[in-house]
Amino acid sequence: MIQMDNSALQKLTETISLKYFKMPFKHKAYFNKRLRTTGGRYLLSSHNIEVNEKQFAKFGESAIIDIIKHELCHYHLHLQKKGYQHKDKDFKRLCQQTGAPRFCSAIEKYEDRVNYIYQCQKCASRFPRIRKVDTNKMVCGKCNGKLKELNN
């Protein structure tokens, strides 16, 4: 398997920034092993970009390129004092111009992460959940029936 270290990621980020945005990337890009639910993130305070190492391991360099493009959209817009958030028109426009995706592929499917399954005692609907639910407070969203935890 091909490996990519932080220096290769830095070089790739600088190259993508010049190629797609026609502006230099003057900060740091590095892998963060602690990222779990996101492909990468742009840090507003330091202007650095962190990338989820597991994305490279599972999906390869093309996924990393897409993540870098997305984070560079945040980076360049923030430095230009334009709308850098997902909801902003500037961000959506720049993502479209550069071919940066709005989201990346999930590393694990939701079904694989499910730890609890609840069933409505009234309509028998099943609800897979990652986190435990307080069955005294939560009710079925379809019929307002009482939920019961099933043993996996």
Curated annotation (Swiss-Prot):
UniProt-annotated catalytic positions: E71
Domain of life assignment: Bacteria
Location(s), subcellular: Cytoplasm
Gene Ontology CC annotations of this record: cytoplasm
Keyword Transmembrane helix appears in the UniProt entry: no
GO BP term, pick one: response to stress
Range of residues in the leader sequence: none
Major localisation: cytoplasm
Pfam families the record matches: SprT-like, Zn_ribbon_SprT
Record: residues binding Zn(2+): H70, H74
Cofactor(s) needed by this chain: Zn(2+)
Record-linked SMART domains: SprT
Domain SprT-like intervals: 9-149
Cofactor binding remark: Binds 1 zinc ion.
Family: Belongs to the SprT family.
Name of protein: Protein SprT-like
Organism per entry: Staphylococcus saprophyticus subsp. saprophyticus (strain ATCC 15305 / DSM 20229 / NCIMB 8711 / NCTC 7292 / S-41)
